[in-house]
Amino acid sequence: MEFKVEYKSANARACRIKTTHSEILTPAFMPVGTLAAIKSLDAIDMSEILDAKIILANTYHLYLRPSSKVIKQMGGLHGFSKFDRSFLTDSGGFQAFSLNKISKPDEEGIKFKSHIDGSLHYFTPKSVLDAQYDFNSDIMMILDDLVALPASKERIELSLKRTIKWAKEAIDYHKLKQNQGVGMGQNIFGIIQGGTDFEARRICSQALCEMDFDGLAIGGLSVGEENEVMYDTVEAMMPYVDNNRPRYLMGVGTPEDLVENVARGVDMFDCVMPTRNARNGTLFTSFGKFNIKKAEFITDHSPIDSKCSCYTCKNFSRAYLNHLFKAKELTFFRLASLHNLHYYLNLAKQMREAIIKNEFENFKKEFYRQRTC
């Protein structure tokens, strides 16, 4: 993977990442395709209409169904889904933890039951990489020990111990596999844990920065803490996160979260929010968000956002979308998802342009001003 910080505006960064399958300009938002598909959209929508350079898929779900072996047989995620740009796959540890009441992390990994058929499974630092080698994802995430917030000091210390141990096992295993000719075009990111404890974040950041990861992710935030707590935690740990590698904040977030964390030096984001909200009728715009189901839109000729150039806004009215949503017409999911994802991807482009011009602070002020109009 090639990586370069091209421009800065205060702490905000505009970077260039080159993988085997695409070139990614940051700040970058990654649409979430849990099952190797963005809900209601296909590979053509993602590449030709939205021009997404990278999407995220989920190791836990794909490992269970259809299985990593089936995906490998079908040509990896790219051959299977026909999305020919970059894939980032998470380790599945979060899902193993959050979807299973009986999940049991220990010193070697995480035991869990399949939410599909109840079968027992065990994720280890090596096994989650083996699945991702089968996927041939461009960026692989390591297994980490997630801390549910709020957490005791003892639980955070245990999480750090496991996360650092598993990170070392993962990077050593990846080097071994590459020496054997496996995963040659694949990259591996470490995940920094520590809850909202600044000292724990510093310790974990420094430990992982000493390892030869291609990029560094911030995990364990946006899990119920107040927004300001998340922002303060990111800001406190950034001095200890390597400047010369991509920085990825996992599972974040709202448009405001993206702007605030880009201001603090984050490069990459993913979140289900744009597509999940789209399916519930909530649409993002330059002036905030609104729900299309309201009666005021029944005869509204205007597009979702007059400043938006997406496929949906160029072709359809609020009135039509209001009708589709109330009629439970499946077409609504596609049109709303196209709009919301375009909004997020375009927000990332606008932030990049502002950073290149060294005007990010002005962009941020205007971003919030429009939301109060």
UniProtKB/Swiss-Prot annotation:
Pathway: tRNA modification; tRNA-queuosine biosynthesis. Signal peptide: none annotated. GO terms for molecular function: metal ion binding; tRNA-guanosine(34) queuine transglycosylase activity. Coiled coil: none annotated. GO terms for cellular component: cytosol. Zn(2+) binds at C308, C310, C313, H339. It is an enzyme of class 2 (transferase). GO terms for biological process: queuosine biosynthetic process; tRNA wobble guanine modification; tRNA-guanine transglycosylation. Its cofactor is Zn(2+). Its EC number is 2.4.2.29. Keywords: Glycosyltransferase, Metal-binding, Queuosine biosynthesis, Transferase, tRNA processing, Zinc. Binds 1 zinc ion per subunit. Substrate binds at D90, S91, G92, G93, F94, D144, Q193, G220. Pfam families: TGT. The active site is at D90 (proton acceptor), D270 (nucleophile). Catalyzes the base-exchange of a guanine (G) residue with the queuine precursor 7-aminomethyl-7-deazaguanine (PreQ1) at position 34 (anticodon wobble position) in tRNAs with GU(N) anticodons (tRNA-Asp, -Asn, -His and -Tyr). Catalysis occurs through a double-displacement mechanism. The nucleophile active site attacks the C1' of nucleotide 34 to detach the guanine base from the RNA, forming a covalent enzyme-RNA intermediate. The proton acceptor active site deprotonates the incoming PreQ1, allowing a nucleophilic attack on the C1' of the ribose to form the product. Belongs to the queuine tRNA-ribosyltransferase family. Homodimer. Within each dimer, one monomer is responsible for RNA recognition and catalysis, while the other monomer binds to the replacement base PreQ1. HAMAP family: Q_tRNA_Tgt. This is Queuine tRNA-ribosyltransferase. It comes from Campylobacter lari (strain RM2100 / D67 / ATCC BAA-1060). The gene is tgt.
